[in-house]
Amino acid sequence: LKQGRFDDVTVYGSDPVAMVKDFVAAGASYIHLVDLDGARTGTGYNQDAIKRIIDTFHIPVQTGGGIRNMRDIEEKISIGVSRVIIGTAAVDNPDLVKEAVKIYGDKIAVGIDAVNGMVATHGWEKISDVSAVRLCNQMAEYGVKTVIYTDISKDGMMIGPNIETTKELIDKTGINIIASGGVTTMTDLEKVDKIGSYGVIIGKAIYQGALNLQEVIQRFEKK
């Protein structure tokens, strides 16, 4: 998707397992999966594909999209997901996050996707009145250890990440921030690394060949 728009989609392959095989061959040790159908509708359509990936490669997988209640979380954990990302529900039902963290600890992460500093929900189709910084601090109070922060205006555009807001979240919350959206070059990765990001999610830049995953891993992955 470009900037989260479901009417601007590029499909890079019809077989997620084959795609992940290439990532693993390049040295990937953690896979980020988003159920875009689930994010939009609140129903996990791609459970079987996620399970096939986990069963095939036996490496940690984090996944989000359509996680709206405890049953959704339990289903993901039961098929072997290492980290479940709660997005929309963190705004609409923050008590779910609090309850989930009590049960599953650091297996729970929160996805904060923002436009102009305000959190977007429901597959990025609704803009809330909650700021990214405020939600991040609230989630930290609930015991969340990891937040995936996406600047929607950057996502899929290959124009570089939002370093300023990512740094603000790191500095003001003190929790692990994984940067997402717009990362395209080694210079982008150096900037994200320099501000103290816990990690980074790269998608389109790999699919389109702007970044070589093996080179990225060799240079930046912490042992």
Segments predicted by a language model, with ranges:
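Conserved, mostly hydrophobic/aromatic
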Residues: F23, I31, K76, V110, ...
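Conserved anion-binding
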Residues: K2-D8, E74-I77, V81-D155
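Charged helix-capping and loop-helix junction motifs
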Residues: G44-K51, P94, E125-R134, I159-E168
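Catalytic cores of alpha/beta
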Residues: F57, V61-R83, E164-G199
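Hydrophobic faces of well-ordered beta-strands that scaffold small-molecule active sites
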Residues: I31-L33, V61-G65, V84-I86, I108-I112, ...
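Glycine-rich, proline-tolerant flexible connector loops at the mouths of alpha/beta enzymes
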Residues: Y30-D48, T88, I148-I159
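Glycine/small-residue-rich loop that forms an oxyanion/phosphate-binding "nest" at active or ligand-binding sites
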Residues: D37, Y45-K102
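Glycine-rich phosphate-binding active-site loops on the catalytic face of alpha/beta enzymes
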Residues: G38, I67, S78-L96, D151-S153, ...
